[in-house]
Curated annotation (Swiss-Prot):
The gene is UBC7. Its EC number is 2.3.2.23. The keyword Transmembrane does not apply. GO terms for biological process: protein ubiquitination. GO terms for molecular function: ATP binding; ubiquitin conjugating enzyme activity. Gene3D superfamilies: Ubiquitin Conjugating Enzyme (3.10.110.10). Keywords: Acetylation, ATP-binding, Nucleotide-binding, Transferase, Ubl conjugation pathway. It comes from the Eukaryota. This is Ubiquitin-conjugating enzyme E2 7. It catalyses: S-ubiquitinyl-[E1 ubiquitin-activating enzyme]-L-cysteine + [E2 ubiquitin-conjugating enzyme]-L-cysteine = [E1 ubiquitin-activating enzyme]-L-cysteine + S-ubiquitinyl-[E2 ubiquitin-conjugating enzyme]-L-cysteine.
Length: 166
């Protein structure tokens, strides 16, 4: 019998196929595994990432939606809120409840009402406006703040590379 998580993910995938959302596309990495999705984010207009096609893997836990998925870019990504291994660091992907380090309110963290669509729109928003207050990539955050030209060059390289890979 299918689990609550797999049924919910099947429904979300079906909804996204029927009603695509601007800015990203999503599908399964392997048709037999509803818990691992392949997503492509289109670099948002009027941002440094414009024109890019950034691939990522979204991995859902067995107890979804009670726990958040992880999202990891497989395309090169230079951003203050993306770890060097590609993992995305935004509040809504952090486990529910209080933040042990005190940076985030519980209301900013994961809740079961989030969907693939709301996660992807949050990531697109992150690309539009990095949060350099609690960075995953300290070097990118420093460049974003202090050496914007260097930051832009690195992002431009990522965009060009993503276009070549697409």
């Amino acid at each position: 019998m299918a689990s609550q998580a797999s049924l919910l993910l099947q429904k979300q995938l079906k909804d996204l196929c029927k009603h695509p959302v601007d800015g990203f596309s999503a599908g399964l990495v392997d048709e037999k595994n509803i818990f691992e999705w392949s997503v492509t984010i289109i670099g948002p207009p009027d941002t440094l990432y414009e024109g890019g096609f950034f691939n990522a893997i979204m991995t859902f836990p067995q107890n979804y939606p009670n726990s958040p998925p992880t999202v990891r870019f497989t395309s090169d990504m230079w951003h203050p809120n993306v770890y060097s291994d590609g993992r995305v660091c935004i509040s809504i992907l952090h486990p529910p409840g209080d933040d042990p380090s005190g940076y985030e309110l519980a209301s900013e963290r994961w809740t079961p009402v989030h969907t693939v669509e709301s996660i992807m729109l949050s990531i697109i928003s992150m690309l539009s406006g990095p949060n350099d207050e609690s960075p995953a990539n300290v070097e990118a955050a420093k460049e974003w703040r202090d050496k914007r030209d260097e930051f832009k060059k690195k992002v431009s390289r990522c965009v060009r590379k993503s276009q070549e890979m697409f």
